[in-house]
Amino acid sequence: MELITELFDEDTTLPITNLYPKKKIPQIFSVHVDDAIEQPGFRLCTYTSGGDTNRDLKMGDKMMHIVPFTLTAKGSIAKLKGLGPSPINYINSVFTVAMQTMRQYKIDACMLRILKSKTAGQARQIQVIADRLIRSRSGGRYVLLKELWDYDKKYAYILIHRKNVSLEDIPGVPEISTELFTKVESKVGDVYINKDTGAQVTKNEAIAASIAQENDKRSDQAVIVKVKISRRAIAQSQSLESSRFETPMFQKFEASAAELNKPADAPLISDSNELTVISTSGFALENALSSVTAGMAFREASIIPEDKESIINAEIKNKALERLRKESITSIKTLETIASIVDDTLEKYKGAWFERNINKHSHLNQDAANELVQNSWNAIKTKIIRRELRGYALTAGWSLHPIVENKDSSKYTPAQKRGIREYVGSGYVDINNALLGLYNPDERTSILTASDIEKAIDNLDSAFKNGERLPKGITLYRSQRMLPSIYEAMVKNRVFYFRNFVSTSLYPNIFGTWMTDSSIGVLPDEKRLSVSIDKTDEGLVNSSDNLVGIGWVITGADKVNVVLPGGSLAPSNEMEVILPRGLMVKVNKITDASYNDGTVKTNNKLIQAEVMTTEELTESVIYDGDHLMETGELVTMTGDIEDRVDFASFVSSNVKQKVESSLGIIASCIDIANMPYKFVQG
């Protein structure tokens, strides 16, 4: 035990998220432990009687209870399942918050009760560590009631109290039980006799036994029932990296993020009409389709003879023109249609190609030869579809370039322009790292100083408030690499929270032009599944990359104020649209985009998501904890009416989008390999 105590670093606290920030006294938290999908948390509360009746902390309360719980991947609160791989760091983090709360709100006593079975055999070490923390951090003002440590075999108790206040005088601390002890006056003061054993005990021992007697009867379930939590805060807690630096700057901007995601009140961008017209222009579509030279790719792969190259090109172009009139040239539907047409055309020539190639393997048995040739065909098809979508996406996106290049930025103030330039230049890494909690002020490896970063974020926030609005129907694209644990939480929760400013592009930059190649993800399902790796769409793929590559397709950006730099403020070739920090998106569709083209095995996903404003989020909900623990189903408490909450619609949206079954092809063409970092960071 001494060894563990000495090795313990009392400065090692884990990231903590306030799950109900509207409360004047913060009192419900999640603790981010490594990269687990389910995270431990805790609630601060007080009891109004000797039973299970509990309530939120209020000003003037003198006794506080800490009740541990588990925050599930779906965003619900359940009984504690465990403290993660490092129970000691959890306790350190919990008591850091507890001590701050006690000092700030003048609370005299605080108690944690935890099942010993959930401490990974470290119950005593946890008590010792708590004692050390209190002694080192309270300056001698608080002490532990050590007489409570060994009272109970089931629970580990830790009770802290103000040193100069008698425990029996603190409201909320039970009186010494007359069932357990007899009080006897003596020359040295009051002494207590244990009624069962007849032994004399100290006053602290009698108080400890009385506290344990009262609290042993209480259930954590009673505390979990009717707990209020913020949906935004849940998404925040589940988008955390495994470590972060909660500097005052991080806390400042975390608290104000929701303000930037109110419904858009800015005017439409100055070239709104031109953007809409070009996006749906037949001429722009025809020009972009001219870049689809699948005939050449077919010929180079020995699928067709040279004299059929121009015929194939014309066939694909005509079919696409017929099916895509009036459709936005950069929409996911357009890319999906093109990928599907290329794939259908490939299938027409598969039989002859297959026969020619299988004859080359006459030395193999039939099954082995078929498998070998089929794998070769899948690799060829994957490369061709990726190539054609890459060419189309680049040409279609470039049609919008004049709008960005000639963008008028006169509406922004000099300070706002400076903030935008710093972000779109080399400062975006430092700015977003500070917002993500990855900026370490003690390690100067950045370009900007802490004060420069804070000023830049303030200027950018101001630019968003003075920003502009996109017309409806514009699709934005972005790539991202994500920890598997965060990805899995997003899959279950169906929402994702961006702490940082979100760099997106007007053109489909995720299809081979930069980073995560998602092309296979837009194939029709029955065809995509023959070449993609994960057949369940939302699972994880074993690849050389331990991160999940995400190709974001984001709609609904017209709902919030945005910044479209362009002109003199940003490189126009990126066609960047910056979305506000603190953005939440609802995940409408996840399509597997993994592929194996013979040289690379990827772990990519194509995700269609929709921007949600603060008004589309119900920030706090009261959940029926009894029903949750009995059935696993989340039910909200609204007086006498119970509303069932479907986690697939965890955030409410009035927009119902039809999900096309043929989306699969395009997902596999996501390409993350060479994209600028700001389109990936987050």
From Swiss-Prot:
Feature type site, description Cleavage: 6-7, 619-620
CDD domains: VIP2
Class of the enzyme per the UniProt entry, highest EC level: transferase
PTM statement from Swiss-Prot or TrEMBL: Proteolytic cleavages at the N- and C-termini by the prohead core protein protease give rise to the mature enzyme.
Temperature dependence: Optimum temperature is 20 degrees Celsius.
Residues annotated as domain TR mART core: 383-614
Recorded GO CC terms: extracellular region; virion component
Major site of localization recorded for this protein: virion
SUPFAM superfamilies: ADP-ribosylation
Alphabetic keyword roster: Glycosyltransferase, NAD, Nucleotidyltransferase, Transferase, Virion
GO BP terms: regulation of viral transcription
Catalytic activity: L-arginyl-[protein] + NAD(+) = N(omega)-(ADP-D-ribosyl)-L-arginyl-[protein] + nicotinamide + H(+)
PROSITE patterns in UniProt: TR_MART
Residues the record marks as active site: 478, 503, 576
Compartments, record wording: Virion
pH dependence remark: Optimum pH is 7.5.
Job of this protein: ADP-ribosyltransferase that efficiently ADP-ribosylates one of the two alpha subunits of host RNA polymerase RPOA on an arginine located in the C-terminal region. ADP-ribosylation of RPOA alpha subunit enhances the transcription of viral early genes. Also ribosylates RPOA subunits beta, beta' and sigma 70 and performs an autoribosylation reaction. Additional in-vitro identified targets include proteins involved in either translation or cellular metabolism such as elongation factor-Tu or GroeL. Mono-ADP-ribosylates host MAZF which may inactivate the latter.
Family to which the UniProt record says this protein belongs: Belongs to the Tevenvirinae NAD(+)--arginine ADP-ribosyltransferase family.
The protein, known as: NAD(+)--arginine ADP-ribosyltransferase
Organism encoding this protein: Enterobacteria phage T4 (Bacteriophage T4)
